[in-house]
Amino acid sequence: MTTIKRRMRVTRLYTGADQQSHFEDLEIEMDDLGLIGHLSARHPVTSLIFRHTDADYDYSWHNAPQRQYIVILEGSLDVEIGDGTHRVFGAGDIMLAEDLTGQGHISRAVDGQPRRSLFITLD
């Protein structure tokens, strides 16, 4: 039997040597475990935060308060970094926020819609 590797995309937001935030696309490998599906290795976490963000959310330059995964459940999140690049994260998308220092990023609601998300802290 051939095992099929699956991958799940995570977008990393981190501070580069230039003290600017950057995006990096990562792929988390998952192993085929048959009937239960594909699973990744365990990733240690410290807490889970449930969050609702209002439709007018517009948070100017800031850094992530700690290393954390942000999982979008409903709605969308627009993240802008220093070079003007925007990425929009929608339901099912995962971001690993690690830009703890430097200029940081801007976060905004998309299309005047509220957002529900999970913050899964790592530190």
PLM feature spans:
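A short beta-strand-loop-beta hairpin characteristic of the jelly-roll/cupin
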Residues: 58, 63-64, 69-90
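Short, Lys/Arg- and Gly-enriched loop/turn segments at beta-strand edges
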Residues: 34, 87, 103-109
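Conserved short histidine dyad/triad with adjacent acidic residue
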Residues: 15, 27-36, 46-64, 99-102, ...
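A short hydrophobic beta-strand segment most commonly corresponding to one strand
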Residues: 95-100, 110-123
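Short acidic, Pro/Gly- and aromatic-enriched capping/linker segments at domain boundaries
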Residues: 2-15
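Short acidic-glycine-tyrosine-enriched beta hairpin
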Residues: 52-53, 82-100
